[in-house]
Amino acid sequence: MSGGINAGDSKLAFESSEHVKVATTFDAMGLKEDLLRGIYAYNFEKPSAIQQRAILPIIRGRDVIAQAQSGTGKTATFSISMLQSIDTTLRETQALVLSPTRELAIQIQSVVLALGDYLNVQCHACIGGTSVGEDIRKLDYGQHIVSGTPGRVYDMIRRRHLRTKNIKMLILDESDELLNMGFKDQIYDVYRYLPPSTQVVLLSATLPQDVLEMTSKFMTDPVRILVKRDELTLEGIKQFFVAVEKEEWKFDTLCDLYDTLTITQAVIFCNTRRKVDWLSAKMKENNFQVSSMHGEMQQKERDEVMAEFRQGSSRVLITTDVWARGIDIANISLVINYDLPTNRENYIHRIGRSGRFGRKGVAINFVTVDDVRTLRDIEQFYSTQIDEMPVKLEDML
């Protein structure tokens, strides 16, 4: 994660609920000295657009709805705010972050620990698929910040290992996904255990109307920091489609593209776990090196795949939408939608992966005859244009 700001920031259109003060440097935010040291040690030089606008209202205790382009430094926005707000002399949980995936919860924990390196902060990732005993031990010891997935967090609160009486801040990251029906009930269960005065911060790349309606239930007069959707994430990302006519022809098309994929690193999205397993097995049968990940895999296995991909030893990753949210890998410049997403809002999460921090990226959509309408729907929804893929794709990378 290099410098917080990117060249596209000056062009972002902000719609905010009130005049939001812009702090153009980290020094201007009045942060703890040791937190500033952590920020600069993390190679952040200047705050990104969302950081310039959201950190101050959060540290002043306001409820905040922040919508920012994927890769603009959302995680650091709330991590810095939490680290500024907690009292490290009190070894009790004071801030709770809920994320839709285990990988994202772990990534947030690592950002908090890195930025809080000089603050002696305790931060635990409380996620399913890991040892309950270890969770209990860590929570009983005392954690300033807990980053977790809703199911395990609720379980630990219910069992009274995660003590909530000192929690003053609840962060909902990727809240469009979190507040989808799957997680909605669990979030309400967690929320009921928190002190009534708890500050709520909601972050997401997309904010559909139903999410905004739900915020009214547990937010008071929130500051809204919104980026207009047509600017969101797609700027700087070249989008193409390949007309494959039939589903069976997608595989040959992918094989033809393989040499181009491995120039940098590529992520290939399928809509189901079964399809991920089938495609990665078929690629390997044909002597193509790929790795794969989906939500049904054991946590340990998912961690290993992520580590290999982060280090660059694996260059092509086949996955489902579980991966599409917030996972930060620097070198990805190519995303392939082997299947177009069933939920058009996931499109931005998938291809936002390929241009993080304003870096250029390429997205390729495999389109059968049946997919044409979906593709047009995506174009219309994002006010964007998806052209036919050029012959010399490598020139784009």
UniProtKB/Swiss-Prot annotation:
Assigned GO CC terms: catalytic step 2 spliceosome; nucleolus
GO process terms (BP): mRNA splicing, via spliceosome; rRNA processing
Superkingdom assignment: Eukaryota
Pfam (any one): Helicase_C
Annotated binding of ATP, by residue: 68-75
Sequence motif DEAD box, residues: 173-176
Catalyzed reaction equations: ATP + H2O = ADP + phosphate + H(+)
Domain annotation Helicase ATP-binding: ranges: 55-225
EC number: 3.6.4.13
InterPro entries assigned: DEAD/DEAH_box_helicase_dom, Helicase_ATP-bd, Helicase_C-like, P-loop_NTPase, RNA_helicase_DEAD_Q_motif
GO terms, molecular function: ATP binding; ATP hydrolysis activity; mRNA binding; RNA helicase activity
Record note on domains: The Q motif is unique to and characteristic of the DEAD box family of RNA helicases and controls ATP binding and hydrolysis.
Protein name, as recorded: ATP-dependent RNA helicase FAL1
Organism: Mycosarcoma maydis
